[in-house]
Amino acid sequence: MDYEVCRKVWESHVPCQFTLQSSGGTHGEPLPFYTMLPRFSYLALAIQKVLSSFNRRDDGEKVHSDKMWLEHNGIPLKMYIPIGVIYDQANLSENDSILEIIVRTSQPPPQFQMVDRDMMEAMFMQNIKEADYLKTKAEITKNMMKDESAQLWRSVCNIPDNFDEFWTIVQKLMETSEGNEFAHIPLRVYVKNQAFKQALITAKHPDGSLRTIGEAVSDVLSSSSSSSTDSQSEHPPRLISHGIDIPHHTPLIFAAKNLSYPDNFIHVVLLLVVP
């Protein structure tokens, strides 16, 4: 693991605008709420601060978290996917770089799932365990102390905003040694308007050569018959993670150790290249 690379990834934030659209109120909607959110965080952790701002309006009407839903460009958002992934999926231009999120108080669509803070913590810790099972058959998480798990979650909640505390714990989850390498790499691939995809992917080919992230993504897509992405296109898709165009030849093990989100998965967004 590279300390400086991981720290830069950790410090990355994205600009977000939350706009309330409700059916009630006599004084109109409150002004949009603007904020910078960590890429590694989740909408489930941000929404209470957003609603607190909206609930200060003069007419006294309150918006409750269990009676609202979120959308971007008409698509319901997933509160349990890292904010950085949502931002990268939006594929915003440099001139329109703010992620605009609509907070609606109408009946939520079936595909929207409300996730509160406690649910998000449980989902995050489950992802950590799944990632460790893929890598080490859960050897690390089985031996983690309870306060270490709690410290990892506090770091995601930015309590406190201390990268070094996170670094201490995540190093244990990323340790490898000669003859004790990761069995598989936790990788999730996102294609527009589809659920994320993952498969059992090794860091090396059978001949011992390093698998690249481009090869790994192709393997994940080929294992999914539902994908509409043409991996044989004349123009290879862009691989985006943390807002970075990841070169296809990047070793997968490097990405796993330096570009994974705090849940220990590499989250890669595929963007098709239009000639």
Swiss-Prot record:
UniProt keyword Ubl conjugation, yes or no: yes
Main location: membrane
Crosslink (Glycyl lysine isopeptide (Lys-Gly) (interchain with G-Cter in lgg-3/ATG12)) position: 129
Keyword Ubl conjugation: yes
Coiled coil: none
Post-translational modification: Conjugated to lgg-3/ATG12; which is essential for autophagy.
Superkingdom classification of source: Eukaryota
Assembly description: Most likely a component of a complex at least containing atg-5, lgg-3/ATG12, atg-16.1 and/or atg-16.2. Interacts with lgg-3/ATG12. Interacts with atg-16.1 (via N-terminus) and atg-16.2 (via N-terminus).
A GO cellular component entry from the record: cytosol
Bias-annotated ranges (Low complexity): 221-231
Keywords annotated in UniProt: Autophagy, Isopeptide bond, Membrane, Ubl conjugation
Entry membrane topology: Peripheral membrane protein
Organism expressing this protein natively: Caenorhabditis elegans
Family: Belongs to the ATG5 family.
Protein name: Autophagy-related protein 5
Main function: Involved in autophagic vesicle formation. Conjugation with lgg-3/ATG12, through a ubiquitin-like conjugating system involving atg-7 as an E1-like activating enzyme and atg-10 as an E2-like conjugating enzyme, is essential for its function. Most likely a component of an atg-5-lgg-3-atg-16 complex that promotes autophagosome formation by associating with lgg-2, but not lgg-1, at the preautophagosomal membrane. Probably, as part of an atg-5-lgg-3-atg-16 complex, required for lgg-1 lipidation; the complex acts as an E3-like enzyme promoting atg-3-mediated lgg-1 lipidation.
Subcellular location: Preautophagosomal structure membrane
